[in-house]
């Protein structure tokens, strides 16, 4: 249920996946290298240096703006945002202020009431990332901090939403949709550490706004906001004011902690960046080509592959999953569409999440082979899950992944036929072991049938066809349990 008193707006900082920094030629591939090895006089802000704008970063930002239905401003400009912090080597950040690259726009999500709704955007602007502090100990009690400027100058876009979200869950849905769109555009790599950071502004209607910083995960946004809603409501119930402030989210503890009083824009003393000309991009707009985006792909999955809307939404929510699905059903496996959608969205996704594996660890052709023998009736669904788990565990251990057919043969998982004497014997044995179930059946309790079917499935390790097994159990019960 939507909590009408909750008002949430997000400021989402996304690193653009360019090869070089925003204002210099330093590489952005810094994560596996030593500290301060991807720096130069420009990104360190040394005297006498001049920034040179990365055109590819602007093109990526414009592509995002177009995909999010924004109006691209014909002329924007960069400004200096002045504040002192150790990770800001120049003591100012080059960003955009009153003349951003794009304005307006929206992101469509499924609201908490199940209806599609538009989350309006305020603006999208381009800026440089600051460096990174490494606290020796922890941020509160460490003896000192180290500064790594490898990240300084990485191109960022900041996507600012209107305060249109009405729950922490809607905020997470907004972020998931935004992430999917950026991945489809090919401008963002969500798997890179620190590639997305969120500042969340939250208030309860009629009370002061609180900004929560230091949120670096999609789940973290929902958890941080849920904690903050509870904290603010508790203050109000006790008759205490909600103070306007900035709080940090401590992910390990799942709480927010007061950091400082919230700054106003005047505190940053913005003024135009004198070393960069105004940015005129009107002639570039016509060259922006968009790929198929998540909403369009979702609709295509419904019409082309007859996926349910829920399955299509899950499959297209991540670019890799959507590509995997189409890889599975390509060629002569078009008849597997419905089965593939169900197994990927419901079964495979859960097994991967349990093992903390990505879908790119799974070979679509091999997974398609598993679905093919399921569809042929060679194995039961329960045995299919067992085969899948063996395949994933082998992959996780770095072992050679067997084919589904080989696993079925090795573990003797082929479905037991209804005319197989072993199955009839298993039914007879289970019935003889459970006389109370026979009494319950005779008393009109049909739940006894399901119980006996389950016991036979255990005895046959899930190899019996449930429908055929149900028929055999009922026949045996009608025959007096013989």
From Swiss-Prot:
Transmembrane stretches, by residue range? Answer: none
Could you list this entry's UniProt keywords, alphabetically sorted: ATP-binding, Ligase, Nucleotide-binding, Protein biosynthesis
Tell me if Chaperone is a UniProt keyword of this record: no
Pfam families found in the cross-reference section: GatB_N, GatB_Yqey
**Molecular-function GO terms, alphabetical:** asparaginyl-tRNA synthase (glutamine-hydrolyzing) activity; ATP binding; glutaminyl-tRNA synthase (glutamine-hydrolyzing) activity
Q: Which reaction does it catalyse?
A: L-glutamyl-tRNA(Gln) + L-glutamine + ATP + H2O = L-glutaminyl-tRNA(Gln) + L-glutamate + ADP + phosphate + H(+); L-aspartyl-tRNA(Asn) + L-glutamine + ATP + H2O = L-asparaginyl-tRNA(Asn) + L-glutamate + ADP + phosphate + 2 H(+)
Domain of life where this protein originates: Archaea
Stretches of the chain forming a coiled coil according to its record: none
Alphabetical list of InterPro entries matching this protein: Asn/Gln-tRNA_amidoTrfase_suB/E, Asn/Gln-tRNA_Trfase_suB/E_cat, Asn/Gln_amidotransferase, Asn/Gln_tRNA_amidoTrase-B-like, GatB, GatB_C_1, GatB_Yqey_C_2, Gln-tRNA_amidoTrfase_suB_CS
**Single Gene Ontology BP annotation:** translation
* Tagged with keyword ATP-binding: yes
Q: List the disulfide bonds.
A: none
HAMAP family, A to Z = GatB (MF_00121)
* NCBIfam families given in the database record: gatB (TIGR00133), PRK05477.1-2 (NF004012), PRK05477.1-4 (NF004014)
Protein's job: Allows the formation of correctly charged Asn-tRNA(Asn) or Gln-tRNA(Gln) through the transamidation of misacylated Asp-tRNA(Asn) or Glu-tRNA(Gln) in organisms which lack either or both of asparaginyl-tRNA or glutaminyl-tRNA synthetases. The reaction takes place in the presence of glutamine and ATP through an activated phospho-Asp-tRNA(Asn) or phospho-Glu-tRNA(Gln).
How is the quaternary structure described?
A: Heterotrimer of A, B and C subunits.
Family note: Belongs to the GatB/GatE family. GatB subfamily.
Q: This protein is called what?
A: Aspartyl/glutamyl-tRNA(Asn/Gln) amidotransferase subunit B
Organism of origin is: Methanoregula boonei (strain DSM 21154 / JCM 14090 / 6A8)
């Amino acid at each position: 249920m939507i909590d009408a008193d909750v008002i949430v707006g997000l400021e989402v900082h996304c690193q653009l996946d360019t090869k070089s920094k925003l204002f210099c030629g330093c590489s952005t591939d810094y994560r596996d290298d030593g500290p301060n090895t991807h720096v130069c006089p420009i990104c360190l802000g040394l005297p006498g240096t001049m920034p040179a704008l990365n055109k590819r970063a602007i093109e990526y930002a414009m592509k995002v703006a177009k995909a999010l239905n924004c109006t691209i401003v014909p002329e924007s400009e960069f400004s200096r945002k002045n504040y002192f912090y150790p990770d800001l080597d120049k003591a100012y950040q080059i960003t955009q202020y009153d003349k951003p690259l794009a304005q307006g726009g929206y992101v469509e999500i499924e609201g908490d009431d199940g209806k599609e709704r538009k989350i309006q955007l305020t603006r999208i602007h381009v800026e440089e990332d600051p460096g990174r502090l490494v606290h020796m100990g922890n941020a509160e009690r460490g003896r000192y901090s180290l500064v790594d400027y490898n990240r300084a100058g990485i191109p960022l876009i900041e996507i600012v939403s209107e305060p249109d979200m009405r729950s922490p869950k809607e905020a997470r849905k907004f972020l998931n949709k935004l992430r999917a769109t950026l991945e489809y555009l090919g401008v963002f790599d969500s798997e890179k550490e620190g590639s997305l950071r969120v500042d969340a502004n939250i208030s309860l209607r009629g009370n002061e706004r609180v900004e929560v910083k230091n949120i670096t995960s999609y789940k973290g946004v929902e958890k941080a906001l849920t904690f903050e809603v509870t904290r603010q409501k508790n203050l109000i119930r006790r008759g205490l004011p909600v103070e306007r402030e900035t709080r940090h989210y401590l992910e390990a503890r799942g709480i927010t902690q007061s950091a400082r009083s919230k700054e106003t824009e005047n505190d940053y003393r913005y003024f135009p960046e004198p070393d960069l000309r105004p940015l005129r991009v009107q002639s570039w707009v016509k060259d922006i080509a968009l790929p198929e985006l998540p909403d369009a792909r979702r609709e295509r999955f419904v019409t082309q592959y007859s996926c349910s809307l829920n399955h299509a939404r899950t499959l297209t929510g991540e670019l890799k999953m959507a590509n995997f699905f189409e890889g599975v059903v390509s060629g002569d496996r078009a008849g597997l569409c419905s089965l593939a959608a169900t197994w990927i969205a419901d079964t495979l996704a859960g097994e991967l999440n349990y093992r903390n594996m990505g879908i790119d660890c799974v070979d679509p052709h091999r997974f398609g082979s598993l679905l093919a023998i399921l569809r042929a009736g060679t194995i039961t669904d329960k045995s299919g899950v067992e085969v899948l788990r063996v395949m994933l565990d082998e992959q996780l251990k770095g072992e050679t992944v067997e084919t589904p057919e080989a696993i079925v043969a090795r573990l003797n998982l082929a479905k037991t036929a209804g005319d197989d004497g072993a199955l009839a014997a298993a039914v007879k044995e289970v019935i003889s072991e459970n006389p109370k179930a026979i009494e319950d059946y005779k008393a009109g309790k049909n739940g006894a049938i399901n119980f006996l079917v389950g016991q036979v499935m255990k005895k046959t390790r899930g190899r019996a066809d449930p429908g055929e097994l149900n028929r055999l159990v009922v026949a045996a019960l009608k025959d007096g349990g013989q």
